[in-house]
Amino acid sequence: MRSVVIVTDAWFPQVNGVVRTLSTTKAELEKEGYQVTVISPDGYRSVPCPTYPEIRLVLFASKSVGRRLSGLQPDAVHIATEGPLGLAARRWCRAHRFPFTTSYHTRFPEYVRLRAPIPISWSYAFLRWFHGPAHRMLVATQSMENELLSRGFKNIGRWSRGVDLELFTNDSQHQRSKPPILLYAGRVAPEKNIGAFLELDCVGTKRVVGGGPELKALIEKYPEVEFVGYKHGPELALEVRQADCFVFPSRTDTFGLVILEALASGVPVAAYPAPGPLDLIENGHNGWVSEDLNHAINEALKVDRDACRKFAERFSWEKCTAQFISQLRPVEAN
């Protein structure tokens, strides 16, 4: 098996964990000698997704995607998203009895429910239909697997995540700021639940790195918060490294790459007990999870930074990509 097609509705120029995961996996696969083709919205007619304009929804893609897959004749197909491109690839694979894998990157039903009065049960029914024929539905954590199993999903496999340990580094000489810097970094959008952090009455300087549809409203509502916009690469790594506590208020993520990036930088994490944080954060060791986010922050500030870094060193993109490869279903195995 040497050629892999990844089909995704989420791709550059979007800035999010899904794109980082897929682009890094593509690079790691290519380092291993694989020929990787990404079928993304690039080159297709598309419209902005309502409430999330950075995502482009491709129009009338079914025949075009089918022609591309027929022409490529890949050894394996991975469908990363449940959008129009994912649906088109799924349709082609089913019609040609071509085995495929899928992955689950976002708690889609909960995400949709935040924006529209669609019952969560309807969304999960759609997801069971979408992922049901896959050889494997890949998830990042045990808690996410347990949740999906309880909702009737089957054929679930593990695909964890990694972190760039050379970019995100721990400052062993770090001295806590007075007051401490409490950092959120990521997309500024309703599903990230940032307001739960910003409205806290806690001791510390609240700092937000990132942008998104909720940014303007939050700037107006919380004038005391430092909003610094998007940061990338070394600038992002510096922002994270200088923080005293990383606050992750989301309840809809399935992993949270930024958690690993914070830990690799020696920064303890405070979060709610949701999938992702529950799998990565050990209370008192590298952060704290609690339904009382203020309490979680206070406890996380007591954590040893070197222990955070040591925990993150267990994760690498090489290991994650090996996991991904092991779950693929080559066509000759059908």
Q: What is each model feature region?
A:
Residues 251:
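Aromatic "clamp/platform" in nucleotide-sugar-dependent glycosyltransferases that forms part
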Residues 174-209:
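Conserved donor-binding/catalytic core segment of Leloir-type glycosyltransferases
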Residues 216-234:
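Nucleotide-activated donor-binding/catalytic signature segment of Leloir-type glycosyltransferases, i.e.
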Residues 99-101, 110-129, 139:
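Nucleotide-sugar donor phosphate/pyrophosphate-binding loop at the beta->alpha transition
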